[in-house]
Amino acid sequence: MKVSDQKIEVIAHQEEKSFIEGDKPLLKMKPERLAGMFGALPAEKRKEAEAKFLESLKSKVDKTVDDGEVLSYCGGITVIFTPGHTPGHIGLYLNQYKTLITGDALNVVDGQLVGPNAEFTPDMDTAKKSLEKFTQYDVETVICYHGGVYQGNVKERLLELAKG
């Protein structure tokens, strides 16, 4: 976003804003992860590289949204607050297209729709409870950050995942 010559509007849930803007440390950027990324550098360069990297992840949030809010883009996009993967994680339902964008709340693995990845989800119990919200929508297509598009028995699969 920082290298784009276009204005990119950053929209997030209020619970996520302080992480995006850098007021709170990112939950997944633990020292051991940073060490894995920058461990090959000499000690005097490592801290500088880590600081520059963490600074590069920060962005100003232009607008905060709440659960159930409908954005005017694409014929209406409903915000679905789905904490668990992060405290302010959201999904988006494109009303006109019956398409659910789940971010990291769901994944597609080997063509199958599966739940959140426990390795990258700090609050698995909350993440699983959040899946129930997806069953309230008339979904024909699911788009996941990891794994891409899932179509087929979407409604049935969402109900199965919500039940655990």
Model-assigned labels for residue ranges:
Residues 53-56, 60, 70, 76-83, ...:
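Metallo-beta-lactamase
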Residues 163-164:
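Acidic/His-rich, metal-assisted hydrolase cores and their charged scaffolds
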Residues 18-19, 69-72:
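A short acidic, often aromatic-flanked loop/helix-cap motif at beta-alpha or helix-coil junctions
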